[in-house]
């Protein structure tokens, strides 16, 4: 059973969010870095699953997310994929339906990049980005780094799906579960396993947001504390235990960056 909500902030502050043995594999920046020189928008396309036909509510490349969000959710795993041991509860093959909301819901309405922010020349998600880099890049286009609650809701929808695409784990829908992790010539770094943003169209959330359960690890700001005080990463290609919408990778500060780290932006509606 997985229960996610504000209580997890304490765990992050204590540094006990599990991240696996390769947390230090990517290089850590020693201070603020320059914002990326090229940041392309997230794509385009009409929102899928957004409430109503309100396409003018968001900037180009963003999707409208609107509905009733549950801050604290109970999701019960019916069967785990891995044998008993350290990694037994890392990957859930199937969750019970429906999930249970354990707190009052609140109305949310915001915009989010349909795809991760990308390199213009390759279409790959930007990587080696810190939270501070993401903040500068998003603010340069009038947007912001997503809050964790916004990211969660854009991923799971009102049904509180454990995975953006449903209740059963189908990692092949996404650029995920890469296990050959270390770079050949730089074994202290993660291998670059990015896929072009949006190249896995079935890795889509109820709102049509892509790649939330794979590709780069995306920076978000934890709710309930001053912005940038506690930051976590959501979704990635390299940690099988971080495939679900409510999963998060903690233990890094706002200046950390690695082969796996990227971002998408959020914004208020027009």
Question: Predicted regions span which residues?
Answer:
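Functional-site microenvironments in short loops/helix caps that host divalent-cation chemistry
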Residues: 131-249, 254, 259
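Short, compositionally biased
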Residues: 2-3, 8-17, 22-139, 159, ...
């Amino acid at each position: 059973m997985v229960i996610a909500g504000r209580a997890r902030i304490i765990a992050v502050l204590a540094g006990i969010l599990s991240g696996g043995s390769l947390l230090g594999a990517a290089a850590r920046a020693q201070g603020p870095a320059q914002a990326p020189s090229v940041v392309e928008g997230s794509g385009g396309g009409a929102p899928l699953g957004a409430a109503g036909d309100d396409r003018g509510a968001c900037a180009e490349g963003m999707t409208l997310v609107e509905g009733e969000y549950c801050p604290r959710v109970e999701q019960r795993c019916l069967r785990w994929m891995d044998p008993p041991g350290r990694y037994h509860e890392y990957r859930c093959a199937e969750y019970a339906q429906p999930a249970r909301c354990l707190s009052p819901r609140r109305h949310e309405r915001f915009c989010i990049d349909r795809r991760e922010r990308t390199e213009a020349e390759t279409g790959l998600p930007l990587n080696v980005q810190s939270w501070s880099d993401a903040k500068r890049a998003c603010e340069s286009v009038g947007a912001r780094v997503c809050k964790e609650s916004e990211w969660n809701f854009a991923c799971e929808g009102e049904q509180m799906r454990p995975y953006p695409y449903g209740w059963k784990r189908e990692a092949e829908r996404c650029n995920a579960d890469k296990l050959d992790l270390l770079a050949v010539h730089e074994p202290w770094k993660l291998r670059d396993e990015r896929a072009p943003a949006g190249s896995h169209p079935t890795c889509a959330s109820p709102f049509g947001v892509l790649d939330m359960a794979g590709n780069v690890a995306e920076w978000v700001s934890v709710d309930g504390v001053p912005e940038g005080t506690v930051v976590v990463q959501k979704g990635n290609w390299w940690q099988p235990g971080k495939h679900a919408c409510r999963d998060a990778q903690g233990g890094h500060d706002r200046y950390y960056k690695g082969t796996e780290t990227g971002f998408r932006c959020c914004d208020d509606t027009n």
